[in-house]
């Protein structure tokens, strides 16, 4: 199985995914999106894009607005300003078409602990209009990719935290989305489980050409070659390739770059 080179650069096998390479639309395009909860502005004119077949890190401390942004993209909240497009589909104008291209792993775990792994996946697939037989076949495929095929009949409550997260990713892939959103997916995991989860998602980008937006506050999950968006207090403070942020901030590592960008004197979005 192909994997990344640990520098954020996908292996040559990525060229075998024509739909990603040929896509004329970014996997996700957000333009001028703001959102408020009463008098508190959670997002302020946020704009960025995620290219098809790329790993993009949305980096920000807790409370930066990452979860609010995901709620807007997934239509849990309605965006009243700006536009959000998933593979060219406006989520307000064409919500069904947009959501059909989208897979999501939320920060809060949403699996039914009393159902088996297979039951969780099949139930999700039926919500997307898949028949039972095709849903079971697809479930076995995505579980094999996640090295969890042997746990298909186990109740979810008997899995480890890392295994539950891998099942949630498998569930998000059931309907073959072209964009995958992950909101702080490694929270609560040990170091080994966290590293395995990051590697699994990077393989999806490299092998299947899926566009990924990975929201995190953990610096170590970002690698050279990644595209990075720094979100702080609801505003995009910077965006660009990993190396671009180092040059812009005149720092030697992404942790120092991040700290300089979220300082009270940090500049506006690039």
Regions picked out by a protein language model, each given a short descriptive name:
Residues 195-207:
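Helical segment within the ABC ATPase nucleotide-binding domain
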Residues 155-159:
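Conserved ABC ATPase signature
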Residues 82-93, 98:
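Conserved ABC transporter NBD signature motif
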Residues 180-184:
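Catalytic Walker B motif of ABC-type/P-loop ATPase nucleotide-binding domains
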Residues 176:
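Conserved catalytic motifs of ABC-family nucleotide-binding domains
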Residues 122, 126, 133-151:
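Conserved ABC ATPase "signature" region
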């Amino acid at each position: 199985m192909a994997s990344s080179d640990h520098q954020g650069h996908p292996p040559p096998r990525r060229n075998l995914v024509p739909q990603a390479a040929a896509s004329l639309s970014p996997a996700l395009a957000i333009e001028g999106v703001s959102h408020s909860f009463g008098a508190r502005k959670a997002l302020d004119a946020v704009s960025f894009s995620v290219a098809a077949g790329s790993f993009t890190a949305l980096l920000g401390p807790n409370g930066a607005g990452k979860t609010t942004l995901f709620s807007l993209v997934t239509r849990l909240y309605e965006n009243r300003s700006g536009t959000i497009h998933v593979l060219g589909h406006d989520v307000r104008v064409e919500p069904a078409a947009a959501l059909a291209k989208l897979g999501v792993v939320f920060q809060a775990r949403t699996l039914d602990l009393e159902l088996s792994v297979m039951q969780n996946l099949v139930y999700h697939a039926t919500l997307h209009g898949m028949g039972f037989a095709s849903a079971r076949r697809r479930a076995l495929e995505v579980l094999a990719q996640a090295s969890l095929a042997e746990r298909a009949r186990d109740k979810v409550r008997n899995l480890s935290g890392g295994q539950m997260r891998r099942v949630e990713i498998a569930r998000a892939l059931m309907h073959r989305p072209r964009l995958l959103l992950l909101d702080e997916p490694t929270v609560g995991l040990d170091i080994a489980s966290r590293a395995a989860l990051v590697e699994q998602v990077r393989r999806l980008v490299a092998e299947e050409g899926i566009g990924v937006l990975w929201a995190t506050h953990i610096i170590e999950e970002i690698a050279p070659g990644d595209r990075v968006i720094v979100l702080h207090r609801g505003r995009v403070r910077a965006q660009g390739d990993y190396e671009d942020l180092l040059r812009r901030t005149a720092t030697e590592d992404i942790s120092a770059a991040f700290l300089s960008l979220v300082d009270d004197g940090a500049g506006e979005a690039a």
